[in-house]
Amino acid sequence: MIERFMRNDKDRPSARDGQQNGTNDDSYFVKFLHWIITLDTYDGSSRNYGRMTETTNYTFFFGGRVRTVTKTSVYSIVVFAMFIVPLILFSIFECNYLWHHKGTNWKPAIVILYYFYLLTICSFLRAACSDPGIVPRNVHIPDLNASYKIPQEYYNYAILPTKNPNASVSMKYCQTCRIWRPPRSAHCSVCDVCVLSHDHHCKWLNNCIGKRNYRFFLEFLMASTISCILLILLSSFRLSYSPQVRYTPVSLLIICYCGLGIWYPLILFIYHIFLAGTQQTTHEYLRSIGSKHPIFHKITRNRDSPYDRNSMFFNLIHLWFQERGWNLVDPRRKQHYPADIRFRKLPEAHSFETV
């Protein structure tokens, strides 16, 4: 219904026309709808978010502040609901009893629980809905007058030297995005973009994990694990105060629910801590071991890596406190001009011939 309305609103008079004709229209309501969700380019708005949808698989919400990948599964909504449900149950059935318990002061523990749940929600939204580090498209096009023909040398790797004589950094030309990808970058076929320091595409968050949101991803795993532990502890104490289990069935339900749900984020958090401690991304690690099943392989340090600081502690500190970097493809800029070739989707080249 919203899509049909937004397709038809192009035929409506704009706000400028309404002011010139002295008539009142619903242009402000239309602008508000296009601010909430961007389905197509809206000529009546001072900001143009629709140009981004032509070169990526993203859909933008709330004036370009929130994004998600289109035509994918709704796992992210399911994940969000799964870690909200136990908090709702705890708030309704458990919190009041523990808060007013006369024997033991549980108020600090409850405050800490809600703090980590708030951190879980915020880090989930930042990791799932923010820019992972998208690289602009169509930056390295050799000849615009030759129908964007790609020369043969662009199909090779560019090897760059490092301070370590035994290590080198390779750069590859992306035929889809038409750029020389920066080191550690990779192209995501789901998002249809190249991402800086690409770690992996997380289907549970429906977003890529890269340089600009990797720390939020780790914070989400850490905060969700701690929240589950606190829920198990508080519900266990609530259950111990009850003479029989049948009087507090919700406590037992929360314990079982969180006891089963804690393992996946906990194992994933430990896995990424060891990866980050060796300055390796998931993409680099899977490529080095030649397998898509990393759980069966031991994580070892690459001594010749130019990114390793020879200390797990300093590697983690650098990862956690490094600058996120600039948003290179900002959907909230004043205007994306149609003539800007960075926002045009060129045909993919499959050979050395003219495309």
From Swiss-Prot:
Gene that encodes the chain: ERF2
Entry's transmembrane regions: 73-93, 109-129, 216-236, 250-270
PTM statement from Swiss-Prot or TrEMBL: Autopalmitoylated.
GO biological process: one example: protein targeting to membrane
Spans annotated as Disordered: 1-23
Residues on Cytoplasmic side: 1-72, 130-215, 271-355
Enzyme class, spelled out: transferase
Active site positions, chain numbering: 202
Function: The ERF2-ERF4 complex is a palmitoyltransferase specific for Ras proteins.
Record has S-adenosyl-L-methionine as a keyword: no
EC number(s) per entry: 2.3.1.225
Sample GO molecular function, one term: protein-cysteine S-palmitoyltransferase activity
Family: Belongs to the DHHC palmitoyltransferase family. ERF2/ZDHHC9 subfamily.
DHHC domain ranges (all copies): 172-222
Protein name per UniProt: Palmitoyltransferase ERF2
Reactions mediated catalytically: L-cysteinyl-[protein] + hexadecanoyl-CoA = S-hexadecanoyl-L-cysteinyl-[protein] + CoA
Cellular component, GO annotation: endoplasmic reticulum membrane; Golgi apparatus
